Every structure is written in structure tokens, then in C-alpha cells.
Regions:
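Short, well-structured N-terminal submotif of metal-dependent ribonuclease cores
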Residues: 1-40, 47-61, 67, 85-91, ...
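Acidic, PIN/NYN-like endoribonuclease modules and their adjacent C-terminal/linker elements
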Residues: 2, 10, 18, 45-46, ...
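Short, charged/polar low-complexity linear motifs in solvent-exposed/disordered segments
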Residues: 31-32, 74-75, 96-97, 130, ...
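General small-molecule cofactor/ligand-binding pocket signal
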Residues: 39, 70, 141-143
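Residues at the C-termini of beta-strands that transition into short coil/loop
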Residues: 42, 73, 146
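Active-site neighborhoods of divalent-metal-dependent phosphate/nucleic-acid chemistry enzymes
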Residues: 69-127, 149
């Protein structure tokens, strides 16, 4: 069974970022080859509205059969608010929490992000998973693209 990964906006932006492209591009190649199913949301689309055109195009190059598109709903908003209420992150990071909530609710295998401050961070990951368990949701694995590529792909 193919892995289903939820990507946040930082991963799309990482496609052209000199610091992250060496790990981001092989990940997108895996998606294009159908080795991975990518999950993204209308939140990602909203966050990309002011991005350069070439960044917006990254998502458009992915084959539709390798994509799951999801939308923000009341349950995702409620779960994101629980992360804030439980002090996993501050309220200014609500959209990061929405990404975590959407991935949790869609039962993604992994959330992939380059956001080390609010997402890919051991303390934050423990916090998100603590809230998930407290409210009856599954734990979620959170990684950077670097952890998902095969080094022979790089």
C-alpha cells in the first residue's frame, strides 16, 4: 500500500528554495511516479495565493491520480483550536495547527513539512499527539522531506 503523505505549504515552497530543493524535488518525483499519494488542502491553496507563479505551478504538475484533496471543516477547526488551547503552540500558529488537524482527520501516514519551529519539532510533535490521544484521535508521524527520500534518489 502506498504511503499517504500530507504536505504543508513549506514543502511546496521548498521546491525552489536553495536550502531545501535537494530533498524536496526527489519527494515530488516520487509523487509523480506514483510511489506516494500526496494529500493537500484548500488551506495550502489559500497560503499559496501570494506565492510566485512558479511555486503555484508545483502542485499543478502532479498527476491527479496521485493526489487527495481535502477541505477545512468544522472538525478540523475544532481540533486545531484544541492544539492552541492545550498550549502546543500559540494562537498565531493556528494555520499550522489546521494543517496538523487536517492530516490527523484524513488519517495521513505522515505529515511532511519544512517548518521546524511549529511542526517538525520533537516538543511540538509530542504536544500534537498528546492532544490527539486525549480527544480520541490517532497519533500522527511528522517528518521533513529529507527523512522521506532514498539517498540514491538524491
Amino acid at each position: 500500500m502506498k504511503q499517504r503523505i500530507y504536505i504543508d505549504t513549506s514543502v511546496v515552497g521548498g521546491f525552489y528554495d536553495i536550502e531545501f530543493m535537494d530533498y524536496t524535488r526527489p519527494l515530488f518525483d516520487k509523487i509523480k511516479r506514483g510511489e506516494i499519494i500526496v494529500i493537500y488542502s484548500n488551506l495550502l491553496e489559500k497560503e499559496l495565493q501570494n506565492a510566485p507563479e512558479k511555486v503555484k505551478e508545483v502542485i499543478k504538475t502532479l498527476p491527479s491520480e496521485n493526489i487527495e484533496y481535502i477541505e477545512i471543516n468544522d472538525e478540523s477547526i475544532d481540533l486545531a483550536q484544541k492544539y492552541v488551547d492545550e498550549n502546543v503552540v500559540g494562537k498565531s500558529s493556528f494555520e499550522d495547527c489546521l494543517h496538523i488537524a487536517l492530516a490527523t482527520l484524513t488519517r495521513a501516514d505522515i505529515i511532511v513539512s519544512w517548518n521546524f519551529k511549529h511542526v517538525v519539532n520533537v516538543t511540538r510533535i509530542r504536544g500534537y499527539n498528546s492532544v490527539n490521544l486525549k480527544y480520541g484521535y490517532p497519533q500522527i508521524d511528522i517528518r521533513s522531506p529529507r527523512e522521506l527520500i532514498d539517498y540514491e534518489d538524491k
